[in-house]
């Protein structure tokens, strides 16, 4: 996982956040296109770890979103039970298609109009869209105080540049997502879950 100043700053911010009860909502979005199929089992294990770590945090509601295939975009119901999200994720499979990051960001903005969306976590490996459009949406999320945490699988330079820009403009953070960084990634994902719940538990 990238030990960037943005990520470290975020972890410091989480540690300083007072614990409080709340009704926070976290959107967890996945690229489920064919390019991720090779590493999907490992990714699913790590993604599941995040939800299980979030289960003990009070006041946290989760929504799973993913895109794949020909313009297929799925968003689950809001769930306070992480097991239900894990069940949905267990049945997922990858299908060839273009990325729909724009749709993820627009969905987060729309959801924020009716409920308290605390942050967005996105995991993907590619970006095949208009960077300016993604930047505009990320900036809007930043104005809404909804940071986007971008985790990148593989090392595509174009995707990395776009992911880092989305994270910067929204006030979030960027990190690598790969098998070699499991321990640090779990630390970051758990920190994101705690941040979304509105507090930090040592």
Model feature map: region roles:
Residues 27-28, 121-122, 147-151, 175-176:
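Structural recognition of the beta-strand scaffold that forms the well-ordered cores
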Residues 1-76, 81-123, 127-132, 154-164:
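Von Willebrand factor
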Residues 65-68, 123-125, 151-154, 177-179:
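Active-site-proximal beta-strand/loop segments in catalytic clefts of secreted hydrolases
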Residues 170, 174-202:
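C-terminal "exit" segments of structured domains
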Residues 50-53, 136-145:
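Catalytic-core regions built around general acid/base machinery
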Residues 144, 162, 169-170:
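Short, structured coil segments at secondary-structure junctions
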């Amino acid at each position: 996982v990238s030990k960037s100043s943005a990520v470290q700053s975020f972890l410091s911010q989480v540690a300083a956040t007072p614990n409080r009860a709340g009704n926070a909502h976290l959107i967890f979005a996945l690229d489920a296109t064919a390019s991720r199929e090779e590493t999907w089992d490992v990714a699913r294990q790590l993604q599941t770890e995040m939800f299980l770590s979030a289960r003990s945090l009070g006041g946290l509601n989760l929504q799973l979103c993913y895109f794949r295939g020909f313009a297929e975009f799925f968003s689950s119901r809001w769930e306070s039970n992480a097991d239900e999200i894990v069940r949905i994720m267990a049945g997922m499979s990858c299908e060839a298609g273009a990325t729909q990051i724009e749709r993820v960001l627009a969905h987060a903005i729309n959801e924020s109009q009716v409920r308290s969306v605390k942050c967005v976590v996105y995991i993907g490996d590619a970006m095949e869209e208009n960077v300016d459009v993604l930047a505009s949406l990320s900036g809007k999320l930043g104005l809404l105080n909804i940071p986007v945490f971008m985790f990148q699988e593989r090392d595509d330079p174009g995707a990395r540049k776009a992911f880092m820009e989305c994270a910067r403009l929204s006030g979030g953070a960027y990190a690598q997502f790969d098998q070699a960084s499991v321990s640090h990634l779990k630390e970051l994902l758990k920190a994101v879950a705690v941040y979304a719940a509105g507090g930090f538990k040592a």
